[in-house]
Amino acid sequence: MENKVIQDRLTLLRAKMQEEGIDFYMMPTADFHNSEYVNDYFKVREYFSNFTGSNGTLLVWKDGAGLWTDGRYFIQAEAELEGTGVELFRMLQEGVPTIEEFLEQNIQQGQTLGFDGRVIAAMDGKKYEKVLAKAQICIAYEKDLADSIWTDRPDFPAGKVTVLDEKIAGKSVEEKLTQTREKMAKDCANALLLTKLDDLMWLFNIRGCDVECNPVAMSYAYITEDTATLFIQQKALDTQVSEYLAAHHIDVKEYDTVVDFLKSLPAGNVILVDNRYCSYTLYKTLQKNQRLIEGKNPTELLKAIKNPVEQSRMQEIFLKDSVAVTKFIYWLKTHVGKEKITEVTAADYLEQKRREIPEFLDLSFPTIAGYKSNAAMMHYEATPENCATLEPEGMLLVDSGGQYLGGTTDVTRTIALGPVSDEMKKHYTMVAAAVMQLTHAHWLYGCTGRNLDILARQPIWDMDIDYQCGTGHGVGYILNVHEGPQNMRWRFTGGMVEAVFEDGMDITNEPGIYIQGSHGIRIENVMLAKNDVKNEYGQFMHFETLTWVPIDREVIDEKYLNDTQIKYLHEYQKTVYEKISPYLNEEEKEWLAAETGVK
């Protein structure tokens, strides 16, 4: 079935490309800060392709178009691109060219690649330069072709900014600036251009609301050895925030003056830039007169290691969040089949339980509630117009989280609503085993997620199955639900940043199995990396679990587990009951006792 709306938009875009002398036009999923999740204003790729996932790049040329996305979105993209004329390129699959390889093979000498350099990361822009230089291809990077076509484009975001109290942040702005400058000095830089939104919020102890579910404000910062300049929309600042920034000696300038400011800098500064988040436009602006050190934002690692105040508040918040999710599971299991419940109304009920928590601020991402085969799409999102009705059979996968004044949560449970097949039981059991094996990791300091990923993936690989995504990611503190530099994946990919686990880093533990057209299973906890014994061999480490939500006993078949896996699972379920039951009523408590096997 043709999607004429998208086809017509692409026709208008191609006409604009011809007018501007552009042969290939690229649209990533990004804002001016290369954020993972973006405000509606920046959803240009979605506007021209119909693909709604959080990761993907659209490339359009005279007689075709292609979308590159990762394994989380293959099923979703296939459905959403149907009839648009946009071809799906499945990243990291055998025989599928990368976007750079595709350009190298298809763009001709003398042709032009165009994009809006403000939404292309410098790292990517430099790759395209290198690939295309061989064929004398021109890059036109000051072209936002969407603006004249997207006539009802949403307004540029400018939500209210708030101050995060130091008692909640755990460190003052001065302490954070001192730590940042120390790391700048180690990199031999006398200035830092900071463009990553969550790093900016962390550094200045402020929060915004410019991206749905991500408490960030559109901003940049230029940090020197003795000054800090924040570029932010001043209409987003009230008197309290302005006075707070002034009291901490932070010079505030209008957001859209950053390019002129950088152009006005005296030549010869040694400026640290992180090319993953610095836009190609800003990079090219600085490159003309400044010496650039291309490295990682020092703030990223500082932010990832949660301080004692953050850790303490996270433990409190994760417990409250776990209670809310447990109550939701009880409600779901006792009401399904007795009243109409859809994927959407189930998600709404869970949100309602979270809103009852006094510290609740917002969801940390739109809830994913996928019933039966819908759960095979890792980032499926139901709508009131298009959602499944739940029946007392099969399984519902619910991936959800909250933003609280005290932490950001992310938890997934796959819930049996009635009878399931033997294959589903086996798959569920092995996913639970995978979670438990990683939970009990014990390692020497120096390991990254790539070293530990096999602990979760092995039980699933043993069935000749894989999940096309990472096993874990960091989680922000009243910030983005996806945070680096720590992550957990089994293989190295281009541009991937690896980080050694440090005491106080958090990481999700979320293996899964996704069978297209049948079912999807994921179980997800968040864990803290902590120091353990230190001896002549070095510093040993382990994980402490933050998430305490029951694993569905109805779908566990212990014949697939070894004695150690059974022991780990029983210990987790017992701890869930001990921690959660004091907050439940008698009926809920009795159900939880049976659900966890303590009764």
What spans do the regions from the language model cover?
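Active-site neighborhoods and metal-handling regions in enzymes and metal-associated proteins
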Residues: M1-K599
